[in-house]
Amino acid sequence: MLPARPEPLPVDPKTTAVIVIDMQNAYASPGGYLDLAGFDISGAAKVTHEIKGVLEVARSAGMTVIYFQNGWDDGYVEAGGPGSPNWWKSNALKTMRARPELQGKLLARGQWDYELVDDLTPQPGDIRLHKTRYSGFFNSQLDSVLRARGIRHLVFTGIATNVCVESTLRDGFMLEYFGTVLEDATHQAGPDFVQKAALFNIETFFGWVSTTADFKGTFGQLAPG
């Protein structure tokens, strides 16, 4: 049983995937998109460290590890034009419109901003998926990848708790996946209350909330079987 709020729940490593949401330079490194857009990323380094430890345990326990990278083609066709709400609400797109010298640099595949942070390089057997909107289920292969492997439980880490983490967990709930977020392996985009609100939403309506210590304590002694 994995200790969690609002109650502990059974988690079988063979049917569990750890989802790493958007641990890219854009969201976790100084000079990345979130930093340039004025968001506080001071907690990102600790989150990176926590995720690294979680992934070591997850792999040893035989869990599937899935990395997401958020962004678009270098021409931003996938981002949508003015006819898309994403064009209006994406802070990356708004930042580039306000600062034309950044055009083509933020969240574009092939650019430093898009790449995963150095400390979270995927290992052999890990899966890497691309997404173009907040939810990892939108226009991606995630659902088919999970179903093909018999995955029923998703453990979420990454940035930002209140945006892409929560969006993906919510969509997973609608598709009958059990979702748990490791609260100290996530970081919000915005003030501290946003993190608390997102975690409240998750544990009350859409899933469960646990910690990296409880995850590692539950699965750290397991070997794949």
UniProtKB/Swiss-Prot annotation:
Originating species: Caulobacter vibrioides (strain ATCC 19089 / CIP 103742 / CB 15) (Caulobacter crescentus)
Swiss-Prot/TrEMBL keywords: Hydrolase
Biological role: Hydrolyzes ureidoacrylate to form aminoacrylate and carbamate. The carbamate hydrolyzes spontaneously, thereby releasing one of the nitrogen atoms of the pyrimidine ring as ammonia and one of its carbon atoms as CO2.
Active site: 22, 131, 164
GO MF entry, a single one: hydrolase activity, acting on carbon-nitrogen (but not peptide) bonds, in linear amides
Enzyme class (EC, first level): hydrolase
Gene: rutB
Known catalytic reactions: (Z)-3-ureidoacrylate + H2O + H(+) = (Z)-3-aminoacrylate + NH4(+) + CO2; (Z)-3-ureidoacrylate + H2O = (Z)-3-aminoacrylate + carbamate + H(+); (Z)-2-methylureidoacrylate + H2O + H(+) = (Z)-2-methylaminoacrylate + NH4(+) + CO2
The EC number(s) this enzyme carries: 3.5.1.110
InterPro entries per record: Isochorismatase-like_dom (IPR000868), Isochorismatase-like_hydrls (IPR050272), Isochorismatase-like_sf (IPR036380), RutB (IPR019916)
Signal peptide: none
Gene Ontology biological process terms in this record: nitrogen utilization; uracil catabolic process
Entry-linked NCBIfam families: RutB (TIGR03614)
Name of the featured protein: Ureidoacrylate amidohydrolase RutB
Protein family according to the UniProt entry: Belongs to the isochorismatase family. RutB subfamily.
